[in-house]
Amino acid sequence: MAAAAPVAADDDERRRRPGAALEDSRSQEGANGEAESGELSRLRAELAGALAEMETMKAVAEVSESTKAEAVAAVQRQCQEEVASLQAILKDSISSYEAQITALKQERQQQQQDCEEKERELGRLKQLLSRAYPLDSLEKQMEKAHEDSEKLREIVLPMEKEIEELKAKLLRAEELIQEIQRRPRHAPSLHGSTELLPLSRDPSPPLEPLEELSGDGGPAAEAFAHNCDDSASISSFSLGGGVGSSSSLPQSRQGLSPEQEETASLVSTGTLVPEGIYLPPPGYQLVPDTQWEQLQTEGRQLQKDLESVSRERDELQEGLRRSNEDCAKQMQVLLAQVQNSEQLLRTLQGTVSQAQERVQLQMAELVTTHKCLHHEVKRLNEENQGLRAEQLPSSAPQGSQQEQGEEESLPSSVPELQQLLCCTRQEARARLQAQEHGAERLRIEIVTLREALEEETVARASLEGQLRVQREETEVLEASLCSLRTEMERVQQEQSKAQLPDLLSEQRAKVLRLQAELETSEQVQRDFVRLSQALQVRLERIRQAETLEQVRSIMDEAPLTDVRDIKDT
C-alpha cells in the first residue's frame, strides 16, 4: 500500500503538468498579444504624429511659398519702380542735355550771324573809306606792295645763292661718284669723319646711291670688322676692290680739282685699314653728324615741348580743382543766400499781409467815416436850408402881429415911442447876431468836415502808395526768388547728374543683393520641397512595410535635422 501511494502521486503529478504547461503557454501568448497590441498602438500613435508633423510641414511650406512669392513680387515691383524712376531720370537728363545742346547751337548760330553782320559792316566801312580816300589808299597799297616786293627780294636772293651753291656741290659730288665708279676695282673703301671729309658736311649727297654702290663691294665688304671706335661718325661708303688700289690712285688723280685730289688722298689713306670700317647692322642707317645733331636738337625740343605740355596739364588740373572748389563754395553761398532770401520773403510776405490787413481796416474805417461825414454835411445843409426857409415865413407873421400889436399898443408919447424903438432895435440886433452866429457855426463845421475829408483822402492816397510800393517790392523779391530757385534747381540737377553714376552703382548693388536674396529664397523653397519629398518617401515606405520590424527600422532611422542629410532619390 505504501508503494502504491507514491505511484498514484506520480500519476497525479504527471496529469497536472500538461495542464499547467497549457496555462503557462496561454498566459505567455496573452502577454505577447498585449505587448504587440501596445507596440502597434504606439506605432500607430507615432505614425499619426508623423502624419500630423508632415501636414504641419506642408502647411508651413505652403505659407513660406506664398510669403516668398509675395516677397518676390514686391521685390520685382520695387525693382521695376526703381528702373522706371531711373529711366525717367535718364530721360529728363537726356532732354535737358538736348535742350542745352539746342540752346548752344542757337547761340552759335547767333554768334555766326553776328560775326557775318560785323564782317559785312566792316566791308561796308572799308568801301566807304576807300571811296572817301581813294588816292591815299592806292598810294598806301602801292607802298605796301613795294615794301613786300623788297622783302621778298631780300629773302629770295640769299636762297637762290644757296641753291646755286648746293647745285654746284651736288654736281661735284656726282662727278666724284662717277669718277670712282669708272675706276677699276682697286679702291676698297672710303672712311672718314666730319672733320676730314667735306662731303660729310654737305647735306646734298643722298644715302640711297651709296648703299647701292656698297652692294657691289665683293668679298672685302664682307670681311669688314666691327671693332672701330663708336664715337667716329661714318659718312662715306664702301666699294669693292683689292689691295693694289694704291698704284692706280695717282693715275685717277689726273684731271681732278684740288678738292677732288684731297678727297682721293683721303680715300687712299682710308683704304689702308679696311678692318676699321664700321658697317651698321641690318635695319639701321648711317646718318651725317649734322643730321644727327639736328635730330638731337629736335629731340631736345620735343622733350621741352613735352615738359611744357605736362606743366600745362598740371596747371589745367590744378585750375580744374580750384574751379571745382570755387564752384562748391559758390554752391554753398548760393544755398545760404537762397535760404536767407526764402526766410526774408516769408517775413516780407507776412509784413505785407499784415500791412494789407491794416490798410483794408483803415480803408473800411475811412469809408465809414466818409459816409458818416457825408450824411452829417447833408443833414446840416438840410437843417440850414430849413432854418432859412423857416425864418422868412416866421418873420412875416411876426411882423403882422407886431404891426397889429403896434397898432393896438402904439405909444401915446414920444419917450414911449423912443423906448419902443430902442427895444425893437435891440431885438433886431440880437436876431442878426444869432443868425450870424448860426451861419458862422455852420461855415466852421463845413470847413472842418472838408478838412477832415481832405485829410482822409490824403491818408488814403498815402496808404495806396505804400501798398503799391510794397507790392512792387514783393514782385521784385519774388522775381529774385524765382531766379535763385532756377539757379538752385540747375545746381541740383548738376549735382543729381553727378550723383547719377553713384545712384546707378547703388541700384546695381541693390539689384544684385535682391537677386542673391531671391536665390536664397529659391534655395529654401527647394530645400522645403526636398524635405517634403523625403517625408513622403519615408511615409510611403512605412505604408509599404509588411512587418513591424521594417516599420520600426524605418522609424529608427536618423531624424531629418538638416537638408544636407537628405539623400537624393
UniProtKB/Swiss-Prot annotation:
Plays a role in membrane trafficking and in homotypic early endosome fusion. Participates in arteriogenesis by regulating vascular endothelial growth factor receptor 2/VEGFR2 cell surface expression and endosomal trafficking. By interacting with SDCCAG8, localizes to centrosomes and plays a critical role in ciliogenesis. Belongs to the rabaptin family. Disulfide bonds: none annotated. Keywords: Acetylation, Cell projection, Cilium biogenesis/degradation, Coiled coil, Cytoplasm, Cytoskeleton, Endocytosis, Endosome, Phosphoprotein, Protein transport, Transport. Heterodimer with RABGEF1. The dimer binds RAB5A that has been activated by GTP-binding. Interacts with SDCCAG8; this interaction is important for ciliogenesis regulation. Interacts with RAB4A; this interaction may mediate VEGFR2 cell surface expression. This is Rab GTPase-binding effector protein 2. The modification Phosphoserine is found at S189, S193, S200, S204. GO terms for cellular component: centrosome; ciliary basal body; cytosol; early endosome; Golgi apparatus; intracellular membrane-bounded organelle.
